[in-house]
Amino acid sequence: MKKYLFVALAALVLTGCLSRPPEPEQPQPPVTVEPVTPPVVEEPQPPVTEPVPQPPKIQQLDWLSSVQPLVNQMLKADGVNPGSVLLLDSVKNNTNGSLQTAKATSALHKALASNQTFSIVPEAQLATAKQTLGLSADDSLGSRSKAIGLARIVSAQYVLYSDVSGDVKSPTLDMQLMLVQSGEIVWSGNGAVTH
C-alpha cells in the first residue's frame, strides 16, 4: 500500500511539471533612474545666549577704622576694671545682605591687641571652650546668653558682643560690653562702618 501511495504521489508531482520548454524572456528596457538632489541641510544656528549678569561685588569695608573709635570709647568707659579678661565674640551679620564679618572680628582683635585694660581670651582657648559646649570652632554664638555661658567657661569677666545691622550698603556696627557675672551692659556704642 505504501508503494502505491508513493507512486501516486510521484505521478502527481511529475504531472505538475511543465512539459514544454520555458519561453525566453523578453529583455526589458532599462529603467532610467533620475538623480535626486539631496535636500539642502541648513546649518543649525547656535542658540542666542543672553549675557550672564555680573555678580554683585563684595564691598570692601574698612573695618579697622570703623571699630577703632568704638574700642577707644569702650576702654575709657566707667565701670571697666583694668586687668580684666575679655571674651571677644565674633561679629554677627544682621544686615539685609552678605558681609565679611570674619574681617570685622579680625579688626576687633587688632584694635584690642595693644590695649592695657583687657587681656583677650586666646582664640585656641575659645575654640576649646566652644567644643566643650558642643559648638564648632567657627560657630557664631548668636546670642548674648551663649556668649556669657562661654565666658564663664574661660573665666572671663567681660564679653564684647558685636553685630552689624541695617542696610548692607551702609551698615552700622553695634557693640556692647557686658559684665559676665551679672549680664549687665557696662558700655554700648555704635557707629557707621566706613568704606
UniProtKB/Swiss-Prot annotation:
It is found in: Cell outer membrane. It comes from the Bacteria. It is a lipid-anchor. A lipid is attached at C17 (N-palmitoyl cysteine). GO terms for cellular component: periplasmic side of cell outer membrane. Residues 24-38, 44-55 have a biased composition (Pro residues). GO terms for biological process: peptidoglycan biosynthetic process; regulation of cell shape. Residues 1-16 form the signal peptide. Keywords: Cell outer membrane, Cell shape, Lipoprotein, Membrane, Palmitate, Peptidoglycan synthesis, Signal. A lipid is attached at C17 (S-diacylglycerol cysteine). The keyword Flavoprotein does not apply. The keyword Lipoprotein applies. Regulator of peptidoglycan synthesis that is essential for the function of penicillin-binding protein 1B (PBP1b). NCBIfam families: lp. Interacts with PBP1b. This is Penicillin-binding protein activator LpoB. The lineage of its organism: Bacteria, Pseudomonadati, Pseudomonadota, Gammaproteobacteria, Enterobacterales. The gene is lpoB.
